[in-house]
């Protein structure tokens, strides 16, 4: 397979530990996996071997790319069945999982998923809004799965709770090739107040120590 040059070395994919009720979710996960392999991009993900997590991690691993899973000890018996895929880092808390995924990745993509996927997605969006990172965040909007969320965010913009600049943190597309192209072209934009904020050490914003990002 011919490789396509990418600005990213590793992309973190948030997705469900379930497979969903439509074959289109399965197909989208495989298409994204194949696009990562084609572009010579490694995978960071939640560490499970079930649902969409297991599907995309196995496909990327089979394609010869490195797979790094981050999973809390308490979830391992539930989300890992049989042999683990690729490299797995075990952490103590959900917060540490998100921090390590954020530290390891150059960009983020959310496939369809449940509460855990939503929470991971919204946290990295918030980190971007606060200037903690400048990494692209994309929604793989399979069959309009995220249409309602995007409408909800647009409502928050209209009502004055989210700035129009912060709205542009998120990019979305219905398929993996289009989404990855948008991520490649992404240019960070922040509200003026962000440039006035000083974090203790933004280069080490994502750590596993204490309660820091």
Swiss-Prot record:
pH dependence of activity: Optimum pH is 6.5.
GO process annotations (BP): cytokinin biosynthetic process
Keywords on record: Cytokinin biosynthesis, Cytoplasm, Hydrolase, Nucleus
Domain of life (superkingdom): Eukaryota
Protein name per UniProt: Cytokinin riboside 5'-monophosphate phosphoribohydrolase LOG2
Upper taxonomic lineage: Eukaryota, Viridiplantae, Streptophyta, Embryophyta, Tracheophyta
Transmembrane stretches, start-end: none
Catalytic activity: N(6)-(dimethylallyl)adenosine 5'-phosphate + H2O = N(6)-dimethylallyladenine + D-ribose 5-phosphate; 9-ribosyl-trans-zeatin 5'-phosphate + H2O = trans-zeatin + D-ribose 5-phosphate
């Amino acid at each position: 397979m011919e490789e396509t040059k990418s600005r990213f070395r590793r992309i973190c994919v948030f997705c469900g530990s379930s497979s969903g009720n439509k074959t289109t979710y399965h197909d989208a996960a495989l298409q994204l996996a194949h696009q990562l392999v084609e572009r010579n991009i490694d995978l960071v993900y939640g560490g499970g071997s079930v649902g969409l997590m297991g599907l995309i991690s196995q496909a990327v691993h089979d394609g010869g790319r490195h797979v790094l899973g981050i999973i809390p000890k308490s979830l391992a018996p539930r989300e890992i069945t049989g042999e683990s895929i690729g490299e797995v880092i075990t952490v103590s808390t959900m917060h540490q999982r998100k921090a390590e995924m954020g530290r390891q990745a150059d960009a983020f993509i959310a496939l369809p998923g449940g509460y855990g996927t939503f929470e991971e997605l919204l946290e990295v969006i918030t980190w971007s809004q606060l200037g903690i990172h400048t990494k692209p965040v994309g929604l793989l909007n399979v069959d309009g799965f995220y249409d309602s969320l995007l409408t909800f965010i647009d409502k928050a913009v209209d009502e004055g709770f989210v700035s129009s600049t912060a709205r542009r943190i998120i990019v979305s597309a219905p398929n993996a090739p289009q989404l990855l192209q948008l991520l490649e072209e992404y240019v960070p934009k922040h509200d003026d107040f962000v440039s006035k904020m000083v974090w203790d050490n933004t280069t080490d914003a994502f750590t596993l120590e204490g309660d820091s990002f």
